[in-house]
Amino acid sequence: MSVLRIDHLRHSFGSLIVTNDVSMSIEDGERHVIIGPNGAGKTSLINQIGGQLRPSAGRILLGNTDITGWPPHRISRMGLARTFQRNNLFQNLSVIENLRLAVQARFGNPLNFITPVSRLRNLRNHVEQLMQRVHLDQGLRLVRELSYGEQRQLEVGIALAAEPKLLLLDEPTSGMSPAETGQMINLIANLPRSLSILMIEHDMKVVFSISDRITVLNRGEVLATGTPIEIQTNNRVREVYLGISP
């Protein structure tokens, strides 16, 4: 079953077409990676899926629900969460405090400081589970004291706090050291298959380590979709994206 389906999506900024008749689907539990050269329309595409951009034409289905043009907060309530290329963390709060705010936002009353003991216990358990899931073990550290890679891990944890069925990751390893990249690969690989993932990524080692299927965008259009092996051996992809002549 498709958790996400995109039909003939189109978006333009004036005369500049950034998404041109894009159709694709994400299956339940799939790890689907979007690749393409700079300016291919990758971020514009997931911004339309997440509600940050309104499509000019086409439709987006999350499960059986048409979410085309919905605002981000409404799409989030339907089970979609995402990260961005630039994080939105509270730098002067601790890891635990950032995660706790995200969990409270998911379950309601994020600013209610008079909370029953049982609910506080459940809240603490949720936060601890999220820390384990994203491989963070120093909950009292302030975010500004974390490494760049650790901040990206925390951002994934905050997205997971919403308990989504579809997670959008926008270049999660961008700017990371090799060690940090390896940690992020391990984190994503260990997320449960009950969660579907759509990811933009430029590091081909990461792409081929994680993906079940890959979609290649070029100039706002789908150049190819297939398994990692199919994409690696596609002559058109090798020429346009990988720069290898057939």
Where do the language-model regions lie?
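Glycine-rich phosphate-binding loops of nucleotide-dependent enzymes
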Residues: 2-246
